[in-house]
């Protein structure tokens, strides 16, 4: 659409193409972190609210192994759980709100796993996704990181570090 408008204005396409090729999202905003063992790993740690998580779930190809949780900061957790349920193959939940999310999802989803610690949830998500062909692990928590981290950036870095360590282990002889 942008190229059509650019052409309509009779402007050269080269600068538009150059700008498009140089564009990238900031870290932890629906970024493809790794792909191995038939699984793609997406880091959307910035998604600290329901709307952002729902947008990510709409953007990532199914089947989705979702990593959700953290610290609730208001909003209707039960209604949010019902909205995400239809997008998920598996829910891997963690943190202060993990148990509450699991209860809200139990009538809508068969595969729900709850962990206290974030890194355990990431490892479990990778293991569970490996059993589902062409799956996507999506960290798009929907809640703040402050139960275990200083910021969403720190949570995103932890996700990346854990995923890359798992990738190294898969490639090790």
What are these regions (language model features)?
Residues 48, 70-73, 97, 138, ...:
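Short glycine-rich anion-binding loops that position phosphate/pyrophosphate groups of nucleotides
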């Amino acid at each position: 659409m942008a190229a059509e408008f650019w052409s309509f204005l009779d402007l050269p396409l080269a600068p538009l193409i150059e700008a498009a090729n140089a564009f990238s999202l900031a870290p932890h905003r629906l970024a493809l972190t790794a792909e191995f063992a038939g699984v793609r790993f997406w880091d959307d740690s910035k998604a600290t609210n329901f709307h952002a998580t729902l947008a990510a779930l709409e953007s990532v190809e199914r089947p989705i192994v979702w990593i959700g949780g953290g610290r609730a900061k208001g909003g209707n957790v039960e209604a949010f759980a019902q909205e995400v349920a239809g997008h998920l193959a598996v829910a891997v939940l963690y943190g202060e709100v993990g148990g509450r999310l699991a209860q809200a999802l139990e009538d809508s989803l068969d595969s729900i796993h709850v962990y206290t610690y974030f890194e355990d949830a990431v490892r479990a998500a990778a293991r569970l996704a490996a059993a589902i062909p062409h799956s996507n692990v999506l960290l798009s928590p929907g809640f703040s990181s402050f139960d275990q981290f200083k910021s969403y950036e720190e949570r995103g870095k932890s996700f990346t570090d854990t995923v890359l360590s798992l990738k190294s282990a898969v490639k090790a002889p």
